[in-house]
Each structure stands twice: as C-alpha cells, then as structure tokens.
C-alpha cells in the first residue's frame, strides 16, 4: 500500500510523522510512503520530493513573491502523484498549497482517493470554503470535535480523529534534568521564547522579541532565556539571539519539551505550540504579527473574523492565554504581560486551569489521534477497493 503524504509546515510535518508511525504499526512492511515533508516525516522513512521549507510561508502579502515557484511545485507534485498512482493521497493542513493539489487531481480525473487531514478554520473564514472542500475531497479528518458538522452538511464524509497534542511528549519533559545539563540553578528564572517556525514569522517577531528581552533585563537581571526552534529557522534564530540583552540559549529537537518543563513562563508566536505549552503547564503570552496589508485583506475582503486566535482560548471562549496581536505586538506590552506571569502565582494558576479545560475538549485521556487517523485512512482505502471490486 503506497500512501502519498504532503505537509507544508512543521506542525503538519509532526502530524504526518505520527500518522506514518501509526500506519507502519498497523501495516508493517505492507505500507510505503512518498510525498513532501520535513524532519518528522523523513524520520519515518519519507524521501521528500522537494524541501518542505519552500512551502512554509504565512501572510497574504508575504506569499506573493513566492507564488510563481509555489505554482511550479504544485505542477511538479501533481505530475509525481499521477506517475506514482498511490493508494491514497493524504494532504495535511496548509490548504493554500494542498487545496491546489487536490483540485488539480480531481480536474485531471486522477483515480486516487483524496483525503485531507486538518480542516481549515471555517468559523474564522467565510463558510463557503466548506463547499470548496466538499467538491474536491473524498474524506476529511478533523482535529476538533465541532468541525464535522460544518462539512457533513455539504455531503463530505468527515471524521473527528482528535488533536495530536494530547499524545505528544509536551507533558513529559524533564525540567530538572534540563537545568542540570545546562548549568541552570534550580531557583533561577527561565523564560521560554518561541518566535515561530516559518521565516515569515521570525522576520516579524525576532526584533520585537529582542526588544522585549531588553526591557525584561531591567526588571529581572538574572533571568535566562531558552529558545526552542526548528530546522526551518534555526540559523536566523541563532544569529538573532546573540545580541539579546539576557543570556539566551537555542535548543533544537525533542529537548524543547525538557525546556518547557524547566521554564517559568513563555512568550510564543501563535500556533500549535500554544497547545504544547498548555500540555506542559507552562504559562504563556501569545503574540502574532503579519504585514498590515495582509491583515487588512484578511479582515476586509476574505471575511476573517475571530474573537481569539489561540485554540486554547477559542475552545473555552475566554482569554485564558493573553493574546497581543498586530499593533499590540509591542515590546512594552509583551514585557508587561510576561512580567505578570513571572510574578503572579494566581495568574499562573488561573491560566493552568483554563488550559486544562481546553485540552479536555480536545480528547485528553482518550485514544491516540494518530492511530485513529491511521485507521480512518486504512478503512477508507479498503472500502474503496471493495466497492470497485464489488
């Protein structure tokens, strides 16, 4: 059984890696893989058609210069799928790229089951997107329990498989071991800083984060900074932190979970990492910034409308994690919010309680989402073969 998988960013790559591991557990040597992915998927045996980093871009204006190359990659990917004729295509998140792949295959009549993993946020965007997905997909796998109803009413078979953060290692970090390894005293305050996993994110956030650290240095001269990062942006992050006003250490790979357990608070770009911080019970301030033009287009013309952007807050409909977005992504505001979490135990406890409620809504304590997704893919392929052989 050949499964073709496509991930366009690190969070999708992590999902893809867990899905591949579960498929191998279920099928053993009876499954092989092709497609596009990053370090997690490569670790499970994928040879990526081209570097996933070419697709890791966020923001409407930021993506414009990349469009010609991205469209060439779309054409290349469709051609590769036509040649390989896999038993199923599983695209993971990144609908801007993956939607073009799915639509292109349908338009060409390529006989491959078309599966997408991670639903676009239809409550944030105009709900007409549900019709778009229903036209080009055969099966949709969702992370959130309320999502299937949006798509099933359009006739798209949709299954909720759960959010992978609940099965990850974020809650199992060893903070004491991390402090010993890196020479941090047990009582020294540590701040975890996460400036994003895309170049378009770090380009907007590294500078204000550096200024935030300078402000915090005045209030907490003994504070140390730990910066977990990913391969896509590791070089630029490592270069940027050299000029920060506090001792700043960059860590990569799974050590980030030990870092989460060791730290006292976090400053993070909005994204999947907010859920990981919740799992690690690490109080966090969440921020994000895109170009003003991107923000204007998204709200005015594309119908983006959100009370919150952080999934923890969305799930419980309250500001559990402070959000400082766009014009509020300012060093003075970021520093004040971080200081509050470093010094106010009541605020830390309140955030932990709210985060726990959000995680329970994602299925904390239930069956592994990766295994549920693998079972859904296998069952769908087998059902299709049975119908064709009828």
UniProtKB/Swiss-Prot annotation:
Catalytic activity: a lipid X + a UDP-2-N,3-O-bis[(3R)-3-hydroxyacyl]-alpha-D-glucosamine = a lipid A disaccharide + UDP + H(+)
Pathway named in the protein's UniProt entry: Bacterial outer membrane biogenesis; LPS lipid A biosynthesis
Entries under InterPro entries matching the protein: Glyco_trans_19
Keywords: Glycosyltransferase, Lipid A biosynthesis, Lipid biosynthesis, Lipid metabolism, Transferase
GO process terms (BP): lipid A biosynthetic process
Gene Ontology CC annotations of this record: membrane
EC id: 2.4.1.182
Any one GO MF annotation of this record: lipid-A-disaccharide synthase activity
Superkingdom as given in the UniProt entry: Bacteria
Broad enzyme group: transferase
Keyword Ligase appears in the UniProt entry: no
HAMAP family named among the record's database cross-references: LpxB
Family of the protein in this entry: Belongs to the LpxB family.
Known role: Condensation of UDP-2,3-diacylglucosamine and 2,3-diacylglucosamine-1-phosphate to form lipid A disaccharide, a precursor of lipid A, a phosphorylated glycolipid that anchors the lipopolysaccharide to the outer membrane of the cell.
Protein name per UniProt: Lipid-A-disaccharide synthase
Species, as recorded: Paramagnetospirillum magneticum (strain ATCC 700264 / AMB-1) (Magnetospirillum magneticum)
